[in-house]
Regions:
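Alpha-helical substrate-recognition element adjacent to the catalytic core
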Residues: 2-8, 15-138, 210-213, 217-229, ...
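C-terminal cap/substrate-recognition subdomain and adjoining C-terminal extension
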Residues: 101-375
């Protein structure tokens, strides 16, 4: 065997690289990427829900699946999370948590099926026990219920899983998710957690349960981002006390942009979410561009990433073009720049210690309902 044939036999290729060891046929397999878990609040995050009074809460169990309306862009985003994970051969899990009663479970599952949403679990709050015992002030208490369920879910999650959390600005999601992230990271001592939960006036039985669960958690800084849907249009500056990990967003196009920078959804997913807003919510391309610029101003997108995304989305026809080049020169420029782009290195998000007692005082002074209502 001579020439190239002999060389190929002696120095075989392994994948796309030449092996340095004569006769070597394989290389060590790459480690599987870490599993990723997406935990979604259901009401006012996935669904447009209305239960601000007891009468409206009682009406919810009688709604049909077709009566329920999803938030604009959320269906396209969740589909993309699953699709992208499959393409990357990464294990991905989507879970929903709802403070609504389990009696609406059938309608919710039918709604998710209608939307074509693949999910791995859903949990509801059993309100009946509070009604039977006359404990009406715990009907709307969410902190204890959600925190306990999140901790249970973390214990059952794959080791090393990275998490992204999705909630809204109506009541307690920012503080619930932040507490959860700090507890599983080992940043919050058990006694400090108990003091915080007492201040929030949660169900005493839940407090005991949460303390026991927190002792079973293997510490891991697993929560990468917390997304808060600004359904009430709360000023984003009010969330600065929660740190850079928490991202307040005005729409799911903004959420998709940050997830794209995080590397969990491709650009095509951002385009799909943006188009769903154009088609279903009377958004204009100019308004989508303003959404991107808003994220950049608030420093949730790096400046170079924002510039790159703006150009890519202009080329996709999603944003109005602001360039002076024609279409063909722009495409040549984009191809050249992509070839020179280095792999994105995602630095750790700086997480300053949250002063929970002070934060609770400030939020309750503003009229926000964080924990259980006073007796």
């Amino acid at each position: 065997m001579t020439g190239w044939s002999g060389l190929l036999a002696r120095w075989p290729r392994s994948g796309r690289r030449w092996s340095l060891a004569p006769g070597a046929r394989t290389v060590a397999p790459r480690p599987a990427p870490a599993a990723v878990v997406y935990r979604w609040d259901l009401d006012k995050t996935y669904l447009k829900s209305d239960f601000e009074s007891l009468r409206k809460m009682m009406r919810v169990p009688f709604e049909r699946a077709e009566d329920k309306i999803d938030e604009p862009g959320v269906v396209a985003l969740i589909r993309a999370l699953k699709t992208s994970a499959r393409q990357e051969q990464r294990a991905a899990f989507v879970y929903f948590i709802s403070a609504s009663p389990p009696q609406i479970g059938r309608a919710i599952r039918e709604k998710l099926a209608l939307d074509g949403i693949e999910y791995d679990g859903i949990v509801f709050k059993d309100q009946l026990q509070h009604l039977v015992r006359g404990r009406f002030r715990f009907l709307r208490e969410q902190v204890g219920f959600k925190l306990a369920e999140l901790l249970k879910a973390r214990i059952a999650a794959p080791p090393g899983a990275v998490e992204f959390l999705f909630g809204d600005d109506w009541e307690s999601d920012p503080i619930i998710y932040s507490l959860y992230a700090d507890v599983i990271a080992g940043r919050l001592e058990h006694d400090a957690l108990a003091d915080i939960l007492v201040r929030l006036r949660i169900d005493p039985a839940r407090l005991v349960e949460i303390k026991a669960l927190s002792h079973r958690i293997a510490p891991a800084d697993a929560v990468r981002r917390i997304f808060i849907n600004l359904e009430r249009r709360t000023p984003p500056d009010r969330f600065r006390s929660f740190g850079a990990r928490l991202v307040p967003t005005f729409n799911y196009f903004q959420t998709a942009l940050v997830l794209h920078e995080e590397g969990v959804v491709p650009l095509t997913a951002v385009v799909e979410v943006g188009r769903s807003l154009l088609e279903r919510s009377a958004y204009s391309r100019e308004r989508l561009r303003n959404s991107l610029d808003d994220l950049a101003r608030r420093a949730y997108l790096a400046p170079n990433v924002a510039v790159s995304l703006r150009r890519d989305l202009e080329d996709a026809g999603l944003l109005p073009s602001t360039g002076t080049l024609g279409a063909w020169p722009r495409q040549l420029w984009r191809r050249w720049r992509r070839r020179r782009t280095r792999p994105l290195v995602r630095p750790p998000i700086t997480t300053a210690a949250i002063e929970y007692p002070r934060l609770i005082d400030v939020w309750e002074a503003s009229g926000s309902r964080l924990g259980g209502e006073t007796s």
